Amino acid sequence: AKDHFENFYDNVGYPISVARGAYWLGRTYKKLNYEELSVKWFTEAANYLTTYYGQLAFMEINPGKKFELSKDIEVEKDYRKTFFKRDIVKLIYLLDELDEDKYAKFMLRHLANEDIENGSEILAAELATNIDRYDFAIQISKIASYEKRFHNKYNYPIISTPKFINGRKIPDSAFILSIIRQESEFDLSANSHAGAKGLMQLMPYTA
């Protein structure tokens, strides 16, 4: 098993796979009673707390403790000011006012890739959020995460959810938000070929 997971770990690059390989190496060494190596690999997996195996690894080395996702880097004020003064940004806001913001998607992708080191991805995701296109912000953040740049604020949007509907308590907001992110990426107009609609992609006859 050790050789298998080492080979797996050495041949993947995306955080979700790196965390998986490291976690199972941690489990393998734990089974072999190599505590130091086990902790080493669990710690490596726990660097990727937005992944399932990263969270499992965190619980292995920090039983009973809660974790917090890292905050986004701070973008310098001068770069932020310059970014939001650009004509293309004004055009994106104009498209939003005309209810044609779907055409802004590729403009936002372009802006995101312009100056990554100075925070163009973060500002493009912020701009997408400003026009209520959380789905575009998530897509920008997802692409960044494949290169191990994590913009958690925009990759995991938080919107308000009711606690009660018709006197009935509904599930915790974290559970609801996770379903929305998976099913529609917070796209209010999402419609599937099968007929599912809305944020949670419900079928009309089950809604």
PLM regions: where:
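TPR-adjacent "capping" and linker segments in tetratricopeptide-repeat scaffold/adaptor proteins
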Residues: 73-86
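Catalytic glycan-binding domains that act on GlcNAc-containing polysaccharides
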Residues: 14-17, 28, 32-44, 55-58, ...
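Alpha-helical segment of the N-proximal tetratricopeptide repeat
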Residues: 86-103, 107
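Structural signature of alpha-solenoid helical repeat scaffolds
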Residues: 13, 49, 79-80, 112
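Helix-turn-helix repeat elements of alpha-solenoid scaffolds
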Residues: 1-3, 61-68, 96-103
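Alpha-helical adaptor scaffolds
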Residues: 1-13
